[in-house]
Amino acid sequence: MRILAVIPARAGSKRLPGKNTRLLAGKPLIAHTIVAALQSSCCEEIVVSTDSKQIADVAVQYGASVPWLRSEDLATDTSDVIHTVIDLLFKFQQMDVFFDSVLLLQPTSPFRKPETIRHAVEIHKVTGKSVVSVSPISLKPSWCRSIDSQGNLVKPELFQDLEIYCNENPIYKLNGSIYIATAKQIIENKSFYSEPTKPLLLNSISESIDIDTPIDWALTEKLMELNQEALV
């Protein structure tokens, strides 16, 4: 199976400017994902999709390829990463280069391990379905309230039904670390999700970290200082 790994790294982060090249444990943030992808030995090609020459140079330095810089229309705040992935697939196809599947690795999950990537790929190969990483979430609907039009705190009936559901079924959240789907599925449905989609359960809090704000960054550095986690 020929797998294309795509690491999206847009330059224009507003909540944490310059995060993709900011140093974490002595390496740019994006480098940790590139190294993990390389060490997984799962991918035919590892491509960083970016609109930034600086990010591109860092990506190449750590072993990824940047065959094209991302166009402006795919690098806005409202751009969906799926359109970037489809654009890459079409560009490779124009060069007579074809991939069976695409593995999406967000650079904001620096604790993601190579073996976790291999596990996701194995599930995908065995089932033929899309695989998306998720984490357990502790949701207590009994603690949830909304505010009505008069400004009063109320407990909607919806939350009561949700409480019954949560008591009987574990709830998981998407953590953004790993997505994998066939190229055919992505192009036809413009989505990484298939019917059904298989979960990759990440019980590790650190592997589920998604750095998006200065607080996220500070917590990540604190984890490292406490020697509770090691980066690749």
From Swiss-Prot:
It catalyses: N,N-diacetyllegionaminate + CTP = CMP-N,N-diacetyllegionaminate + diphosphate. GO terms for molecular function: N-acylneuraminate cytidylyltransferase activity; nucleotidyltransferase activity. Its EC number is 2.7.7.82. GO terms for biological process: lipopolysaccharide biosynthetic process. Keywords: Nucleotidyltransferase, Transferase. The keyword Ribonucleoprotein does not apply. InterPro entries: CMP-NeuNAc_synthase, Cytidylyl_trans, Nucleotide-diphossugar_trans. PANTHER family: HAD SUPERFAMILY MEMBERS CMAS AND KDSC, N-ACYLNEURAMINATE CYTIDYLYLTRANSFERASE-RELATED. Involved in biosynthesis of legionaminic acid (5,7-diamino-3,5,7,9-tetradeoxy-D-glycero-D-galacto-non-2-ulosonic acid)(Leg), a sialic acid-like derivative that is incorporated into virulence-associated cell surface glycoconjugates such as lipopolysaccharide (LPS) which could be a key determinant in the ability of L.pneumophila to inhibit the fusion of phagosomes with lysosomes. LPS contains a majority alpha2,4-linked homomer of legionaminic acid. Catalyzes the conversion of N,N'-diacetyllegionaminic acid (Leg5Ac7Ac) and CTP into CMP-N,N'-diacetyllegionaminic acid (CMP-Leg5Ac7Ac). Belongs to the CMP-NeuNAc synthase family. This is CMP-N,N'-diacetyllegionaminic acid synthase. It comes from Legionella pneumophila subsp. pneumophila (strain Philadelphia 1 / ATCC 33152 / DSM 7513). The lineage of its organism: Bacteria, Pseudomonadati, Pseudomonadota, Gammaproteobacteria, Legionellales. The gene is neuA.
